Amino acid sequence: MNNPSTTKAPLADYLAHLPLAEEERERLGESASFSELHARLAGAEGAAADAGGDPALASVRARLQLGTPELDDAEMFGVDAQGRTFLKISPPIRRTKVIPEPWRTNILVRGWRRLTGRSNPPKPKRALPRARWQRVGSLRRFILLLLMLAQTSVATYYMKGILPYQGWAFVDLEELAQQSLLDTVQQVLPYVIQFGILALFAILFCWVSAGFWTALMGFWELLTGRDRYRISGSSAGSEPIAADARTAIVMPICNEDVPRVFAGLRATVESMAATGEMERFDFFVLSDTNDPDIAVAEQQAWLELCRETKGFGKIFYRRRRRRVKRKSGNIDDFCRRWGGDYRYMVVMDADSVMSGDCLAKLVRLMEANPEAGIIQTAPKASGMDTLYARMQQFATRVYGPLFTAGLHFWQLGESHYWGHNAIIRMQPFIDHCALAPLPGKGSFAGAILSHDFVEAALMRRAGWGVWIAYDLDGSYEELPPNLLDELKRDRRWCHGNLMNFRLFLVKGMHPVHRAVFLTGVMSYLSAPLWFFFLVLSTALLAVHQLMEPQYFLEPRQLFPIWPQWHPEKAIALFSTTLTLLFLPKLLSVMLIWAKGAKGFGGVIRVTLSMLLEMFFSVLLAPVRMLFHTRFVLAAFLGWSVQWNSPQRDDDATPWSEAIRRHGMQTLLGIAWTLLVAWLNPRFLWWLSPIVGSLILSIPVSVISSRVKLGLRARDEKLFLIPEEYDTPRELRATDEYTYENRWHALKDGFLKAAVDPLLNALACAMGTARHNRAQAIETVRGERIGKAIEKGPEQLDGATRLALLSDPVALSRLHTRVWEEDRDDWLGRWRKAEADDPHAASVPLAQVVPGDAGLLPAAQS
């Protein structure tokens, strides 16, 4: 029993943090204990919960009504079988079976199963009607293959003529067997190195050729505008959307920047509402967050978003307890629970923003193309201010359309899916695109990391088309703010693409998607191939300089075989390679010249921006090469991959971090320079772009991450993009809401969920008590609460925090004990956090009038 004299002070503090009328606050202040206070707050409605020994849980509804009166009008409250109040933060569950097909990646195993009479999984029965675009696509890809092989053959022939040692045909293997090992090495080593150089050159040149022809055809598509197979042309854009064509817009998040995420989502919701089609769309925030502070911030942000947009019953939130299969598992879980309620699903990333017109257009395109399973938009990058991010924004905005249109030209309805800003036909996705873990052990087994390419391949295997709507406006994303954050993202993409290659020979995959798996691997494998090419070139230089040339390769050879050097061929081949690499960029800018460069700063500024971006891309390419080489080796060696969310906000790289990450690259660049200078200083002219970039990697990484330089470049109209010149409404709203959200961002979320009367009510109402009362459960709850009381908020571990946050009964009991026992470690820390927050509402809190903005801690500006 509490002593009334010792209870009055904390009780008055508690009431001061509830938005009450003064008369009501005085009446409740007469309570003799916190149990009585909660009973008075709850009234008769809380009797069931209070009977279970949870006085704070009994008043959850009353406290939430005080802070957010709109919840009652929106009928957001529910009561579970135990009489506990909860918020209807998600629709009723209507479960659908989501059963992944086990992978059989080994063709020998499949053959053995066939021989022994055991069946392999059949190919899905449905097939697309043989449309004209399929024949056209096959013909186009055959032509592309011929162009790549022809171009590579000519270049490789030239490369063979450039290399100095031309006497391989005179090497007699029988003679080699009769001479000493040292003589054999001296005679054969130059030719072995040359063969390696030639093989690597052919692979790399073919890879560059593929990109060149893709960009060239994209240029033609965009210049002429005569793409008869453009999927966005299949809808007029004004057709009414059928009432049963319901669409779920899902946003999977994990430990993200909460103010930015919910700002972008709010801008998207408001844009959707402005179209008048809102009743056919629902929004889902699917959280895999395991940081308790961020999880509480997400809960508050969801409530504020619903209140500001009147989105109760349209915007839903769910946080998973069991985070299996990462993002793909999160989507699977949504499909299993609510997928049957929707015909389509739009997947957004945490940094995505989409206009309502774009979303409605995607649904209309799906309705107009019943054979389409996925339609992918081409998101435009925007919203970043660092110099590095602005250069990347400019590059993707200027050059990206060529490559995206080119991909569409070659692939048509057998195209890419990038995992976000795309619409998916729900039923075939549920039936065919669930991902089983890859069999076996090691780093290339287990849950699939890069799920998007695989889901597109499975959708096409099941007979549905996968399209890119490359000319659809209103789809946006953000890029990493600096080089190191981009490389963190690249590491997990690298591992995921290497894993996906295990599916190359899976039964039923379309050849185009087998090629997609191959290009995904080459996106990263090209880095170590390029590195080894440079190493072999240096080794050949060393052999040429340090070993005595072998002019006579057979006993009765009449004329010597002189090492050859053809600088004119070398220059021609070098020029050709540069043309393939940089002509797409020039064509992109020429297209802008033709269509109007005003949005890019004008003709002069866009041209200067292109030249500066080309210089920086040359400067950063060797740095990326070494990092990607490391990533590939790490994947093959089984080093772990951390799936941390990339930095979404502008962030500068500190010098200490740059030295730690780039220090070895700088030392390698210096050592490589000294070695080549010692061997043959003239060769440094060819190698200087490589070693120079490595030596300068530290200052380039730091300087390019600076916001000040990025803003200055924008003031000078450098790296300008149309979204900055004439900012779309959705992006303006995102910036505005991000600023507002940061102004009153919630900090110390778990501490406030445990102590603050309003946030505790919200956290308890959004949690789910999954089990009935049982002694074992009560024992575990008691241990967790006791541990929290003993350790205090500073020392309590993250796992226990998360467990308490996920259990509303335990969280409400912790709340009760903290206040009843006047725990200074909890209350003192909470009061200090309130005092340190310049945007905290002044106490005592004023009563909230229905229709006002509502009131939650740190929600006042």
Curated annotation (Swiss-Prot):
Keyword Cell inner membrane appears in the UniProt entry: yes
Parts of the chain that traverse the membrane: 142-162, 188-208, 516-536, 573-593, 600-620, 683-703
Gene3D superfamilies: Spore Coat Polysaccharide Biosynthesis Protein SpsA, Chain A (3.90.550.10)
Pfam families linked to this entry: Glycos_transf_2 (PF00535)
InterPro entries named among the record's database cross-references: Glucans_biosynth_gluTrFase_H, Glyco_trans_2-like, Glycosyltr_2/OpgH_subfam, Nucleotide-diphossugar_trans
Gene Ontology process terms (BP): glucan biosynthetic process
Alphabetized GO MF terms: hexosyltransferase activity
GO CC aspect terms: plasma membrane
Pathway involvement of the protein, from the record: Glycan metabolism; osmoregulated periplasmic glucan (OPG) biosynthesis
Keywords: Cell inner membrane, Cell membrane, Glycosyltransferase, Membrane, Transferase, Transmembrane, Transmembrane helix
Location(s), subcellular: Cell inner membrane
NCBIfam families recorded: PRK05454.1-1 (NF003955), PRK05454.2-1 (NF003958), PRK05454.2-5 (NF003962)
Similarity field: Belongs to the glycosyltransferase 2 family. OpgH subfamily.
Function: Involved in the biosynthesis of osmoregulated periplasmic glucans (OPGs).
Name of the featured protein: Glucans biosynthesis glucosyltransferase H
Gene: opgH
